[in-house]
Amino acid sequence: MENLDALVSQALEAVQSAEDINALEQIRVHYLGKKGELTQVMKTLGNLPAEERPQVGALINVAKERVTEVLNARKASFEQAELTARLAAECIDVTLPGRGQTSGGLHPITRTLERIEQFFTHIGYGIAEGPEVEDDYHNFEALNIPGHHPARSMHDTFYFNANMLLRTHTSPVQVRTMESQQPPIRIVCPGRVYRSDSDITHSPMFHQIEGLLVDRDINFADLKGTIEEFLRVFFEKELAVRFRPSYFPFTEPSAEVDMECVMCSGKGCRVCKQTGWLEVMGCGMVHPNVLRMSGIDPEEFQGFAFGMGVERLAMLRYGVNDLRLFFDNDLRFLAQFR
């Protein structure tokens, strides 16, 4: 048993001298493994007299349990030290100032479109869309625009060939809607349109939204009330509105809509060129020829239509003086609208 005590002391000393978990594992195998020192001592029980075996076996088991206990305690100590070191390395100081996330936002044109659509869908209009590459018939002919009209000129329209072009307005969507369904029709048609023009107030590509209502007993008073209410809601203020007689091939009578300048409240400024008025859209009663070519009887149904540039309304609402700013992708400008 003296050899057993010495063996246990040797094992405990080795455990205390171990520098890491790998060394502990080697010590465990050396003393407690299948061929370990204490395991070999246990195998010598067969050489002892039968009456001594229980006592000696119990002593060997106590020795093994003591070594195992010290091994496990030392291993737990190493694991705790390793965990503490890892936590210290990964420690987050919650008192440090945070790094803010830069959030995106809707483009001002998108915001303006959504605002317009929200008003008209609220009063019962649907949203209709159509192709940006149009044929001559739907872009011009079906809208009562004659062949000699200046809008058909290469200077104003982007042509692919003699019959196909980039649409110059969203009116073709109205035509396609009237061709595919019978009145009552209440739609707004938002989308990109293209014209050969580019300066501080014009872009070769811009956004337009047009509206169409076709039903029985529709008159100019209905159109006037709709537009006045839209402008009041869109700009969130009571504005003077006037309708000036004008000419559009697809409406008769036709009018240009002016509103009180939102910058100077009608007193006259640089934006309104000292007139106190701003032109915001065109409108009119749908021409009987347009209804007729779309398969609608103008004797039974009447309608009104209007169209406005989305960029124009966005410029007025947000006080932007250069149309091109909307398309420059300058985050310093766009971040103001988040």
From Swiss-Prot:
BP-aspect Gene Ontology terms: phenylalanyl-tRNA aminoacylation
Documented EC number(s): 6.1.1.20
Keywords recorded for this protein, A-Z: Aminoacyl-tRNA synthetase, ATP-binding, Cytoplasm, Ligase, Magnesium, Metal-binding, Nucleotide-binding, Protein biosynthesis
Gene3D superfamilies listed in its UniProt record: Bira Bifunctional Protein, Domain 2
Listed InterPro entries: aa-tRNA-synth_II, aa-tRNA-synth_II/BPL/LPL, Phe-tRNA-synth_IIc_asu, Phe-tRNA_ligase_II_N, Phe_tRNA_ligase_alpha1_bac, Phenylalanyl-tRNA_Synthase, tRNA-bd_arm
GO CC terms of this entry: cytoplasm
Cofactor comment: Binds 2 magnesium ions per tetramer.
Annotated family: Belongs to the class-II aminoacyl-tRNA synthetase family. Phe-tRNA synthetase alpha subunit type 1 subfamily.
Full protein name: Phenylalanine--tRNA ligase alpha subunit
